[in-house]
From Swiss-Prot:
Annotated protein name in UniProt: Putative transcription factor capicua
InterPro entries: CC-Dev_Transcription_Reg (IPR052412), HMG_box_dom (IPR009071), HMG_box_dom_sf (IPR036910)
Function field: Transcriptional repressor required for the specification of numerous cell types during embryonic development. Required for terminal patterning of early embryos. May associate with gro to repress tll and hkb, restricting their expression to embryonic terminal poles where they initiate correct development of head and tail structures. Required for dorsoventral patterning of oocytes and early embryos. Cooperates with dl to repress zen and other dorsal specific genes within the embryo and promotes expression of the ventralizing factor pip in ovarian follicle cells.
Protein keywords: Developmental protein, DNA-binding, Nucleus, Phosphoprotein, Repressor, Transcription, Transcription regulation
Ranges for region Disordered: 66-121, 135-227, 323-353, 389-427, 444-493, 563-619, 690-739, 784-845, 874-938, 1069-1105, 1151-1178, 1457-1602, 1632-1668, 1701-1733, 1789-1817
Ranges of compositional bias, category Basic and acidic residues: 903-914, 1724-1733
Single annotated GO MF: sequence-specific DNA binding
Modified residues (Phosphoserine): S41, S49
Stretches for region Interaction with gro: 834-1832
DNA-binding region range list: 490-558
Bias (Low complexity): 96-121, 187-203, 211-223, 323-342, 446-484, 1092-1105, 1462-1471, 1547-1589, 1800-1817
Gene name tied to this protein: cic
Polar residues bias: start-end ranges: 409-422, 1078-1091, 1503-1525, 1789-1799
CDD domains the record matches: HMG-box_CIC-like (cd21990)
Length: 1832
């Protein structure tokens, strides 16, 4: 180990030197192939040794040059592990490598660069070291490697010295290098291959910032001879050649350098390594500084080609230490390699060679030191010293070697510190070609981000900059990660045009509404261009004064926007960039790093490597530096440089570190890992690394906190480092903490490092690419942004897949805390859950469950999240696993006889779900996320199915929380999840299918929520994905008045009025109908609508009674999946997320649930007696019954016998996800199932007529109705009137919510048979609901969540008038009885509406009574009124990530707001839609991509999550499809009166959490509020939810943004105040567009529409356009005078009018961006040809739209594509063009908001509705429906 340590020290020194040199030289042997890197023999490594070292530091590789045999020896031992690891993780990110510490390190570096770099192992001795050393890590881009400083150490172990020499001999021949590059390319994929060239070095390790350093360290430590270690280059990329080869170790190398004898060299290097650690502490300053002096000459001396000298290229330093003998050969080889590599992209080796051979490039020490300025100086000095001392020290070698190593170590601190800066620079360089870009420096606060950059770009000395940065960061920004970014983020002063834009943007928006920002900016540019010089002068004057004031205030400020952007990008980017992790925090971190370098130069020099590179504190760094380079690495790429050393030091620990690095940006990971590593060497490193890495990279704060702790830790870490693998990981992070203050600033993005780290391991997240791919088996955590804006966002499902449990639990943990919003808010629960579980990730595919949840996490109610967490089988103690579920099923059997049915249903459901998913996928083909979602959903469904089978509902422990926030958890898939109320405390969750989510998260979330709320979180029915059609849940109406001690007043909207538990009669078409008749399904909705219509009066009556009686109407929150699973396959797709739980309802249920959970056995039974007196029920009857039955299973079991066997059907129906109302607090209604607040008549009719109509429909009546019929049986019993239902399988399944009073008799009659059976199934079936889930109902309509909120008096009224989610969408059912259909749609919307009415109106009950009619919705009236406001939000909601998709499932949503989108909704509320459109015309800006959750980052997060979430989001949105109006209606009405505050609260808190992403609207079941994407949503919500929703809404999306903006503004306020900005600003001249002489400036066609002159000529529109232009003031001028480039900023072709004309023009021309002045002249034939193709495609797509509507079905799309395969060779081409054209068309529509929201949702809805809609929607397409779904 001493030898290795020496080597490590030497390696560190070399790395430092190389960093100083800042050129990455792939030394000799590089690992051969990414896959076989371990397997690759040293020869292979050597063969691939040359790595391009290009300006991009990021990819610097430093490969030790060792003879092949040496490498083989060293590599081989570890080769196998590495190989396997690498093979396991071919990608550069070697998360797997973490398994073997050495492998991990190497892998880490590989992982960091997203190319597959092979890690070649040089070291024989230590596996970890070998892994690090042997593994050659390819950096993403070879060029980046050039940038990073590379240290080439050739210090083979004594035994290997001869080999090394031989190796050198081998190397010298050009052929090997020549061949090497090629082989390297093949072995490594992508950049990997070029990096393989780097592979020449025995080990080229591309180490991510921290990991790389660790790896290198490990390599040095572990390898007797250091091979060239190529660091990812993100920090600094040292190339460590065998000690022998490195015979000129910079200081340490020097020893090796002079000593030709490998043994001595090796010993020296090993000694140096060991000493390095020790010297790191002792010799940092003195040796370092000594080295610096040496280095100075050295850098100048570096040119010596033959002598291994440290040569510094302009961009980077390469310190190459070679034995003199080998040097020659090496130099020759290197030269050859250099040539080869230079010619190829692979320059690392070349650079190394260059440095060795060609000192000219390397000779410029200042810049070569890419480290901070100080680093550069230090590096230069070090290089000079190294060169000068190389020979001297070589001679001195042994003792000096160690001293040199120490010096080098010191250098490492110094250079390493510099290196760190360099590393940071390198990392940045890795990101960017240049080693350290000032930006990076800036970004950096970056250790090396811009050593060279700093040299190049910084006006101030690094030290000054660093000091300033440190001061600033430490001052306040450094204090908190979040705080830091704000402080650290100094907005650049506004220039004249920015001020002008600020002043006129509103005017432009006013003048040219509905223009995208790009066009608006162009118009502003035109205006500015037209502004008179004297007016412009005033702007310039003000701008210059602002700038002066700015620089006075921030003298250190540099405008490195590009670098900053890149660094942040890199951060966001997969670890491919060493600083990627640092990226987000990178800018700050790098800056810190730079500061660190400076500090290093000063006292901190020693610590710099750690501190500046990775360590938070320089001091810490210095301590650790010698000992723990990894610390440095952890924090930064610069750390990376040292990381290898540290790695060797840490040896085994490193591997883990590598993993961590890989997951997060290398730096982050290293940091995180290090701390974690000490704690958890391997396993935890992954997770912790992810977490910690995130913390370190993303959040300086965590490190800042640790910094102070960690300073001690750093020392201990140093010691650990010294000791070896122990403290490496942990110590490194502390170091980071210490210096990190500055460095960590960028981390501010992370919300709470603690939470975040707990929540999700950022390290994993850091590399997005690795989410679930084999590349990062580690289970890279999906990216979780931590900015205030993202706090509520769920982790990306991608990453969490790897470690669902950890991620989930962490996530849940953090999310809970993060999401702490108002505890009472159900959404909060949801949020917490969603956020925490990633989860709300119910929709998350099982694999990603933890991170699932795209932005919509919040959508999923806590229950969902919980369920997700529970999904995680580990977490699912109540339901341990899908298999366990069956056991639970047994439990459930106690509750319900239908367990078997449930199981089979579950099984069926998965199939259905899959089908649905497939359908949905087809439907949503246009939707990018949908496919994934579908897949995820399928998985989820399957899992759910497994889980569903046994829904053993534990008796929930009733909590005495008056407002149990039951967060509605939409079930992502339409799988009927068994919602088993796991102890209420924990939350009753339907067992989630996503096992990935750690089980703890759901519980934790619930607990947190409980703690927060002080109320037990409502048992949240985890998202109950009802299998589309088959699964329907009966809403359990809970009566808060229920005698239950815990009975809380109906939370949210259920007020005492609603106390009487409403009877819900759910009539679902039996599966029979679903399977036997899709038409029946379609028909069913019609019938249902008819039926409800028939029974409307009764309903009204009932409602009145119920409203008064039932304090808590049945949970309105009905998570219904699309009904179409079996029925109209189309419904299925919708169904998956269709289940929405009304958070309010949930709350209500929770209040009741608590009662009922306690009483699940009791309360329900009590309810039975109460039910007996249905009217009595009003007081005590908690009519909360959730019966989620797998209709599919039921149907499948009773395919034709549903009607025939009502009772058995009931048993079968035994809700797979039978959520007893109390247990689930949420009801998942099948899409078909409509809960109508039909009065007795409805109930009766519903039970009888509906059932008959619905065909095997089960009527689940509330206890009251059940009581009437089954008063003896127990109100609890859920009566499934299978027989009644069976008779009319054809009718769409409808859930009739019957007033407890009226319906009971009829309902009970129909339902009596099944009631008993169901009762068995449902622990508390007091609701006495008849579940008739025909296939139609089985598919829970997305809109199924009909609010059965008592609303006011008509609380009972909440009906889920969702016969079919699609059916609803498809007004086709309505045709027969459009009013009913409308009603149903309205039921959804009205549910929401009803709630709304309830909220706003007690009259809602009348509407409800009118419910059968569309009016009930208020679709025309109520809906029309409210939807308009909502419609935009709905629209936006659908447009939210998968909201649109969910919309499919949200026919109600369509019906509701843009429900129009939904066919049924459109049909039913077609008028409404128009109203909304017209109404909703209220101009609402189209949601931004971020709001829609479509921003790249969100998209990444949502990829998997979105898929599952698309289901969830549906439900979660409650506003999305179902949820849209339902969530609004459900939520708002539910919460309206009593719970309005809650909802408001929920909304506000949820919004806050949800806020981060518009999806948050979907995220929180709160739905509409969260739909907050659009103002309408907020207004609608506020309407429904009274003031609160609005505030929350506004607060939500706006508040976070506003808060952030506020912070930023505050930053500028001081500057602006100094300038008296406001006064002067107001005095500025106002531009008068009329005065504008640039016609185009006035006319504002959207820029994209503007065509070149050629097009204009082609178009008939041009003359009018010109006329239009002429109409404008100065039209004549441009027209008359030939347009000159100077005349108009955007050129003659830019004119808004033209754009407008052309947009209206249906010629099918594709829009083109405005041409620059010369563009039209440039349009040559080739361009024309291309344009012609584009135009052809556009016209064809328009043709397709004309034939099939804006949302053509998958079948239509495929057929069209095959028909026009010449134009659309691939289906993707057509889909993309469809999406593009549709977006343009919708964008042009006057109702942008509406289009954006409802249409998009309708798009996804339509996709899912396509199936159901195909049957139903076709029948009944009202105006809106026709418009939206005519294509179906």
């Amino acid at each position: 180990m001493n030898a290795f340590q020496d080597f490590e020290l030497g390696a560190k020194l070399y790395l430092q030197c190389l960093l100083s040199l800042s050129s990455s030289r792939s030394a000799t042997p590089s690992y051969t192939s990414p896959v076989n890197h371990a397997g690759a023999s040293p020869l292979n490594a050597i063969a691939h040794s040359p790595v391009n070292v290009s300006a991009t530091h990021r990819q610097n590789f430093f490969t030790p040059i060792a003879n092949q045999s040496q490498q083989q020896q060293q590599q081989q031992p570890v080769a196998v592990p590495l190989d396997s690891k690498w093979k396991t993780t071919p990608s550069p990110v070697l998360y797997n490598a973490n398994n073997n510490s050495s492998n991990n390190n190497t892998s880490s570096s590989n992982n960091n660069n997203n190319s597959n770099w092979e890690v070649g192992s040089n070291s024989n001795t230590h596996v970890a070291a070998t892994a690090a050393a042997t593994s050659t890590v390819g950096a993403q881009p070879l060029p980046p490697q050039t940038t990073p400083v590379s240290l080439v150490m050739h210090a083979p172990p004594p035994q290997q010295q001869p080999l090394q020499q031989q190796h050198h001999h081998h190397q010298p021949p050009p052929p090997p290098p020549a061949s090497l590059p090629a082989p390297s390319a093949p072995p490594t994929s992508g950049s990997s291959s070029s990096h393989n060239s780097v592979g020449h070095a025995t080990s080229v390790i591309r180490i991510s910032s921290s990991q790389q350093q660790h790896q290198q360290q490990q390599q040095h430590q572990q390898q007797a001879h250091p091979h060239v270690v190529v660091s990812g280059g993100q920090t600094f990329h040292p190339v460590i050649v065998d000690a022998t080869q490195l015979s000129v170790p910079l200081p340490p190398t020097t020893v090796s350098f002079h000593q030709p004898n490998t043994p001595t060299s090796t010993a020296a290097s090993v000694a140096s390594m060991s000493q390095d650690k020790m010297l790191a502490k002792n010799g940092y300053n003195a040796p370092w500084f000594k080295l610096l002096p040496h280095m100075t000459p050295m850098s100048k001396a570096s040119p010596a080609p033959v002598t291994p000298t440290l040569t510094t290229s302009a961009s980077s330093y390469n310190v190459v230490m070679m034995q003199q003998q080998q040097q020659h050969q090496q130099l020759q080889q290197q030269q050859q390699l250099q040539q080869q590599q230079q010619s190829p992209p692979q320059m690392p080796l070349n650079h190394n060679n260059n440095h060795l051979i060609v000192s000219a490039p390397l000779s410029s020490p200042g810049k070569p030191l890419n480290c901070s300025m100080n680093d550069a100086k230090v590096a230069a000095a070090a290089a000079a010293a190294a060169v000068a001392n190389q020979r001297q020290k070589q001679q001195q070698e042994e003792p000096d070697d160690q001293l040199d190593d120490d010096v080098f170590e010191t250098t490492t601190p110094g250079i390493s510190a510099n290196s760190k800066k360099q590393t940071a620079a390198m990392r940045l360089p890795t990101h960017n070609s240049n080693i350290r870009k000032l930006e990076e420096c800036h970004d950096d606060g970056a250790a090396g981000a811009p050593a060279t950059s700093a040299a190049k770009r910084r006006s101030q000395s690094l030290s000054a900059l660093q000091q300033q940065q440190q001061q600033q960061q430490q001052a306040g920004a450094a204090g908190t990660a979040a705080g830091q970014p704000a402080n650290k983020k100094i907005r650049r002063p506004m220039n004249a045009f920015m001020i002008f834009s600020k002043k006129h943007r509103k005017m432009v928006h006013k003048k040219h509404p509905n223009q995208d920002n790009r066009t608006v900016s162009k118009i502003l540019g035109e205006w500015w261009y037209a502004l008179k010089p004297e007016q412009k002068a005033q702007y310039h004057e003000l701008a210059s004064s602002v700038k002066d004031a700015h620089f006075k205030l921030h003298p250190e400020w540099k405008w490195c926007s590009k670098d900053r952007r890149k660094s942040s990008t890199s951060t966001a980017t997969p670890g491919g960039k060493a600083s990627g992790a640092a990226g987000t925090g990178d800018a700050k971190q790098r800056l810190v790093s730079v500061d660190g370098s400076d500090s290093l130069e000063h006292d901190m020099c020693p610590s710099t490597p750690g501190g500046s590179g990775s360590c938070g504190g320089q001091g810490i760094s210095s301590d650790l530096q010698g000992d723990i380079i990894p610390l440095t690495i952890d924090n930064y790429n610069s750390t990376c440089d040292e990381a290898p050393t540290t790695i060797s030091m840490k040896g085994n620990g490193n591997g883990k570190l590598m993993k961590n690095e890989l997951p997060s940006d290398e730096d982050e990971q290293m940091l995180v890992v290090e701390e974690e590593q000490q704690q958890q060497t391997v396993k935890k490193i992954d997770l912790h690394c992810r977490e910690r890495v995130n913390d370190s990279d993303m959040d300086d704060t965590p490190f800042d906190y640790r910094k102070q702790q960690p300073e001690a830790n750093q020392r201990s870490a140093e010691e650990h480092s010294t000791s070896g693998a122990n403290g490496q990981a942990i110590n490194a992070p502390p170091l980071s903490g210490g210096e990190r203050e500055i460095t960590l600033k960028p981390k501010a993005i992370k919300a709470h490092p603690v939470l975040e780290s707990n929540m999700l391991p950022y390290t994993q997240m850091s590399i997005y690419t690795q989410y679930t791919s084999p590349k990062n088996p580690i289970g890279v955590t999906p990216f979780q942004p931590t900015g205030g804006a993202f706090k509520s966002m769920p982790i990306s499902p991608k990453g969490s897949g790897g470690k669902p449990e950890d991620a989930g639990s962490l996530q849940a943990h953090i999310k809970q805390e993060d999401i702490k919003q108002e505890p009472p808010s159900p959404y909060k629960l949801n949020n917490g859950s969603g956020s925490a579980s990633g989860g709300g990730v119910v929709s998350a595919p099982p694999p990603n469950s933890g991170s699932v949840g795209a932005i919509f996490n919040f959508n999923v109610p806590t229950a969902t999240a919980l369920s997700q967490k529970q999904f995680h089988y580990p977490m699912h103690h109540p339901h341990r696993s899908p298999t366990d579920l069956r056991d639970e099923e047994a439990d459930r059997e106690e509750i319900t006889q239908g367990t078997k049915s449930g199981e089979s249903s579950e099984k069926d459901k998965p199939a259905l779900d899959d089908q649905e998913r497939d359908e949905v996928e087809e439907e949503d083909e246009d939707e990018e996320d949908d496919d994934e979602d579908d897949e995820d959903d399928e998985q989820f469904m399957q899992e759910l199915a497994s889980v569903n089978a046994s829904a053993g509902f534990d008796d929930l422990v009733p909590y005495a929380m008056p407002k149990v926030v039951i967060t509605p958890t939409p079930t992502p898939p339409p799988v009927a999840t068994i919602v088993t109320p796991i102890k209420r405390k924990q939350f009753t969750i339907v067992r989630s299918l996503t096992p990935l989510q750690p089980s703890n998260s759901p519980h934790q979330q619930l607990k947190h929520l409980h703690q927060r709320r002080g109320e037990t979180p409502p048992t949240v029915i985890t998202r109950v994905p009802t299998p589309t059609i088959n699964h329907f849940t009966i809403i359990r109406t809970q009566q808060h008045p229920h005698t239950h001690p815990h009975n809380t007043p109906p939370p949210l909207f259920f007020k005492q009025k609603v106390q009487g538990s409403p009877v819900i009669a759910t009539v679902t078409t039996s599966t029979l109908s679903s399977s036997s008749s899709n038409p029946a399904n379609n028909e069913a909705p019609n019938k249902f609508s008819n039926f409800p219509t028939q029974h409307q009066p009764t309903t009204t009556t009932t409602i009145s009674c119920n409203t008064n009686n039932n304090a808590t109407p049945i949970i309105r929150k009905l998570l219904t999946l699309q009904e179409g699973a079996e029925l109209g396959g189309s419904h299925k797709g919708t169904g998956r997320a269709a289940i929405l739980y009304d958070a309010l309802v949930l709350d209500t249920l929770h209040g009741q649930d608590e009662e009922e959970e306690e009483d699940e056995g009791n309360a329900e039974k009590q309810e039975n007696p109460k039910v007996a007196g249905k009217e009595q029920v009003t007081t005590s009857q908690p009519a909360t019954m959730l019966l989620i039955t797998d209709v599919n299973a039921y149907n499948q079991q009773h395919v034709a016998g549903n009607a025939a066997t009502p009772v058995s059907g009931a048993a079968t129906l035994r809700p797979v996800s039978f959520i007893s109302i109390n247990a689930c607090n949420k009801i998942t209604l099948p899409a078909n199932a409509r809960i109508l607040t039909a009065a007795t008549a409805t109930s009766t009719a519903a039970g009888a007529a509906v059932t008959s109509q619905a065909g095997a429909t089960l009527t689940v009546m509330t206890k009251a109705s059940a009581a009437t019929n089954h008063s003896s049986s127990n109100a609890s019993d859920i009566t499934i009137t299978a027989a009644s239902a069976a008779p009319v399988p054809t009718s769409g399944s409808s859930i009739v919510m019957i007033n407890s009073t009226t319906n009971p008799s009829t309902s009970s009659n129909s339902t009596s048979c099944s009631a008993a059976a169901h009762q068995a199934c449902v622990p508390s079936s007091p609701a006495g609901m008849g579940l008739g889930h025909a296939a139609n109902i089985a598919t829970p309509p997305a809109s199924a969540p009909a609010q059965i909120m008592g609303g006011g008096p008509a609380s009972q009224k909440m009906f889920f008038a969702m016969t079919h989610p699609y059916t609803l969408l498809q007004r086709s059912h309505q045709p027969g009885t459009p009013s009913l259909e409308h009603l149903q749609l309205d039921a959804f919307a009205p549910g929401g509406y009803t709630l709304r009415n309830h909220n706003g109106l007690s009259s809602l009950p009348p509407p409800v009574s009118a419910q059968p009619t569309m009016l009930l919705h208020g679709y025309p009236p109520s809906h029309g009124v409210e939807p308009p406001a909502r419609s935009p939000s709905y629209k936006s909601m659908p447009s939210t990530p998968k909201s649109a998709t969910y919309l499919m499932s949200a026919p109600p949503e369509r019906g509701m707001d843009g429900g129009m989108s939904g066919c049924a909704s459109a049909a039913a509320s077609g008028g409404d839609e128009s109203d909304i459109d017209a109404d909703g015309q209220q101009f609402i800006l189209a949601p931004t991509p971020a709001q829609l959750g479509r921003a790249p980052l969100q998209r990444r997060k949502n990829l998997s999550q979105s898929k599952s979430e698309s289901n969830v989001s549906f439900g979660a949105n409650l506003g999305a499809s179902n949820g849209q109006h339902i969530s609004r209606k459900l939520h708002s009405p539910t919460m309206m009166e009593s719970s309005s505050p809650i909802i408001g609260h929920v909304n506000s808190s949820n919004l806050s959490s949800a806020l981060p992403t518009p999806t948050s609207s979907t995220t929180t079941p709160n739905s509409d509020e969260q739909l907050p994407l659009t103002p309408t949503t907020s207004s609608s919500n506020s309407n429904l939810n009274q003031q609160q929703p609005k505030s929350p809404m506004k607060g939500a999306p706006g508040s976070t943004a506003a808060a952030l903006k506020k912070k930023n503004d505050e930053m500028n306020n001081s500057v602006l105040k100094q300038v008296d900005f406001e006064k002067k600003y107001k005095a500025l001249p106002q531009f008068q567009p009329e005065d504008c002489q640039s016609p185009s400036a006035i006319a504002v066609p959207s820029s994209p529409r503007v065509y070149g002159t050629n097009y204009r000529k082609k178009n008939t529109a041009p003359p009018p356009v010109q006329k239009l232009m002429c109409e404008d003031d100065s039209i004549d001028e441009p027209a008359s005078a030939p347009p000159t480039t100077t005349q108009r900023f955007f050129g003659p072709d830019f004119n808004n009018e033209l754009k407008e004309l052309e947009s209206s023009d249906q010629t099918g021309r594709s829009p083109r961006t405005p041409k620059t002045p010369l563009q039209s002249a440039r349009s040559d034939a080739s361009e024309k040809g291309h344009r012609k193709v584009l135009e052809t495609r556009r016209s064809l797509v328009l043709q397709l739209f004309a034939e099939h509507g804006n949302f053509p079905t998958a079948q239509a799309t495929m057929a069209f594509q095959s028909k026009h395969s010449d134009v659309f060779p691939r289906k993707q081409d057509l889909q993309l063009k469809i999406r593009e054209v549709r977006q343009k068309l919708l964008g042009q529509a006057s109702c942008t908001p509406h289009s954006a929201g409802p249409n998009t949702p309708s798009d996804s809805n339509s996709s899912s509705t396509t199936l159901s809609a195909s049957s139903t929607s076709l029948n009944m397409q009202t105006t809106s429906a026709a418009d939206v779904f005519q294509y179906y």
